[in-house]
């Protein structure tokens, strides 16, 4: 969503006239360091496709690609891999071109960034389409989300697979903040508001720093909280042949997930969970 003045990014804290850690930080770098793990994500997508289709995928389309960090990881994996990143935010794509694509060497010729609407993108069919980090939750109506899923279906080769993720659990319905400390900053996930009737939710990401400065509203998301049954039903209605949910295992030494995702028919009623979903054409 476009940030309104109420939700616009602001730099806070620090003494007047002095540079702060927040003023010198890059929100995209902070996001990639705290939210993304493109290596593990591509490991899962690549391995799962090969298990399901008994071949190596080559063509990948990353919807809502942002900085195209994931697309860049894809073209680094194999010399025949190609990636297409689709996003409406041209400024973020330009950041990705400068900080990621330009550093790829020869692989930069195998990545294409499209400044287009994912609902209308028209390009060659691909093996894989990705919609990660819950980005598709921007579509709040069933008909619109089904339309998006159908456009993905039509954009895949005959044995193509659509990969997406989702989160839930009792904490997902709460207005709450969760802080995660890193070496030189703290990531703050802010579920600012939730409407249980419509499912509308407003989520934000903030970053704070040891010098007391802060980036408020570094990122803002105006979403609908979709449930797994709804997502599965809409994928099947859009034409996909089989939909599989991959549940994350538990780390024996902590209450956190272990990063290993396996196919599951039933899940645990945890306070918070994240899953991958595959939808096979």
Predicted ranges, named:
Residues 56-66:
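Conserved class I S-adenosyl-L-methionine
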Residues 67-80:
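Conserved SAM-binding loop of SAM-dependent methyltransferases across substrates and taxa
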Residues 96-97:
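Conserved SAM-binding loop
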Residues 163-234:
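SAM-dependent methyltransferase
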Residues 225-281:
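C-terminal lobe and adjacent flexible extensions of AdoMet/dcAdoMet transferase-like proteins
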């Amino acid at each position: 969503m476009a940030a309104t003045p109420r939700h616009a990014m602001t730099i806070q804290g620090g003494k007047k006239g002095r540079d702060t850690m927040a003023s010198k930080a890059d929100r995209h770098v902070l996001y990639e360091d705290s939210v993304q793990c493109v290596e593990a994500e591509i490991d899962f997508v690549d391995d799962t496709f090969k298990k399901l289709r008994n071949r190596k995928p080559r063509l990948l389309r990353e919807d809502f690609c942002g900085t195209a960090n994931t697309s860049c990881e894809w073209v680094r994996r194999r010399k025949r891999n190609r990636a297409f990143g689709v996003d409406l935010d041209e400024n973020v794509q330009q950041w990705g071109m400068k900080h990621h694509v330009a550093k790829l060497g020869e692989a930069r010729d195998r990545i294409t960034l499209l400044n287009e609407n994912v609902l209308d993108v028209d390009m060659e069919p691909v093996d894989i389409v990705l919609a990660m980090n819950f980005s598709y939750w921007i579509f709040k109506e069933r008909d619109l989300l089904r339309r998006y899923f159908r456009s993905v279906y039509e954009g895949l080769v005959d044995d193509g697979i659509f990969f997406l993720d989702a989160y839930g659990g009792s904490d997902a319905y709460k207005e709450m903040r969760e802080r995660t400390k890193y070496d030189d900053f703290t990531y703050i996930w802010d579920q600012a508001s939730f409407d249980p009737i419509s499912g509308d939710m407003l989520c934000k990401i903030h970053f704070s720093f040891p010098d007391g400065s802060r980036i408020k509203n570094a990122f803002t998301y105006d979403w609908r909280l979709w449930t797994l049954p709804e997502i599965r039903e809409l994928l099947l209605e859009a034409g996909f042949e089989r939909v599989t949910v991959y549940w994350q295992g538990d780390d024996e030494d902590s209450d956190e997930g272990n990063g290993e995702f396996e196919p599951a028919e039933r899940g645990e009623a945890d306070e918070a969970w994240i899953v991958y979903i595959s939808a096979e054409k």
